[in-house]
């Protein structure tokens, strides 16, 4: 039964984060070496081109983990622990970049305080950090409303609809919204679904039967197809910066469950080799 439990996501959460970090690393650093336009080249190119989906996996498991944290600690402790976990490394990176990018003191503080993230471009300095810190800051308020909802799935769906309406309104009615900013706001849906899954993990057990696994595999396959459609073909799907939204949403949720199952199989059936692989991903997950 354990090998088909949704709680596998929680058990292998660190390893899933390690895989996400590895995929992001491929996106930034991997050089495609196969013969151009061969089948292997196309596979390599796709894996590299879609590597930013690892970010969505991070948003998903972050939302999931925050539910446990907010229930375990006071609000003050919650904020302090989140800040200590992520900000010091971000600040030190900013110091290092002062010397490589010739920042003055004002530019440095505008970057490490996240001001430029909101006023100029999200890609000024490790955009994920000010993005996730923003969500950490707002999470307790959101979770307060979430906890009071009688039907949390319906509540999450309503927030989804509100997000979609605001996204389309910003693009089509307000206009002049920085395109790069959608790279952040399009990750909000996966974060709030992570919160929903975290709540489910805390309260009840869900066992995946064959139909649920088939549905999960189908959802992952659909995400891969949409990633090809948006990231490789460059087509739009519903919202601006589509490749950072619906494709990665499906990949992050379904892929996380499939990864958890794979890690469980490695842990169960390939004791020696499996432990080595799991240790590598665990180290990457902790480091990330």
Regions found by a protein language model. Give the residues of each.
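Transmembrane alpha-helical segments that form core, pore/gating elements
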Residues: 192-198, 203
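Interfacial loop-to-helix transition and helix-capping segments at the boundaries
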Residues: 43-55, 117-131, 170-193, 225-258
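Alpha-helical transmembrane segments and terminal signal-anchor/GPI-anchor hydrophobic tails
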Residues: 184-188, 202-287
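Membrane-cytosol interface segments of multi-pass membrane proteins
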Residues: 1-169, 207-213, 257, 268-284
């Amino acid at each position: 039964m354990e090998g088909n439990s949704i709680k596998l996501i929680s058990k292998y959460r660190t390893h899933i984060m390690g895989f996400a970090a590895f995929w992001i690393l491929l996106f930034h650093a991997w050089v495609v070496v196969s013969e151009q336009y061969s089948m292997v080249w196309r596979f390599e190119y796709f894996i590299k081109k879609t590597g930013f989906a690892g970010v969505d996996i991070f948003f998903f498991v972050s939302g999931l983990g925050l539910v446990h944290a907010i229930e375990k600690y006071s609000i003050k402790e919650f904020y302090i622990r989140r800040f200590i976990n992520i900000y010091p490394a971000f600040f030190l990176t900013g110091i290092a970049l002062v010397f490589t990018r010739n920042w003055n003191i004002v530019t440095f503080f505008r970057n490490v305080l996240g001001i430029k993230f909101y006023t100029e471009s999200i890609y000024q300095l490790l955009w994920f950090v000010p993005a996730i810190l923003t969500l950490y800051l707002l999470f307790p308020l959101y979770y307060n409303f979430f906890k009071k909802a009688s039907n949390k799935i319906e509540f999450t769906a309503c927030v989804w609809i509100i997000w979609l309406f605001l996204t389309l309104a910003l693009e089509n009615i307000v206009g002049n919204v920085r395109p790069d900013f959608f790279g952040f706001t399009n990750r909000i849906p996966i974060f709030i679904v992570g919160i929903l899954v975290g709540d489910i993990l805390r309260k009840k057990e869900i066992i995946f039967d064959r139909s649920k696994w088939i549905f999960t595999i189908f959802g992952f396959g659909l995400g891969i197809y949409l990633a090809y459609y948006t990231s490789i073909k460059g087509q739009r799907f519903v919202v601006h910066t589509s490749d950072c939204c619906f494709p990665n949403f499906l990949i992050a949720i379904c892929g996380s469950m499939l990864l958890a199952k794979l890690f469980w199989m490695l842990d169960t059936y390939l004791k020696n080799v499996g432990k080595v692989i799991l240790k590598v991903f665990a180290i990457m997950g902790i480091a990330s």
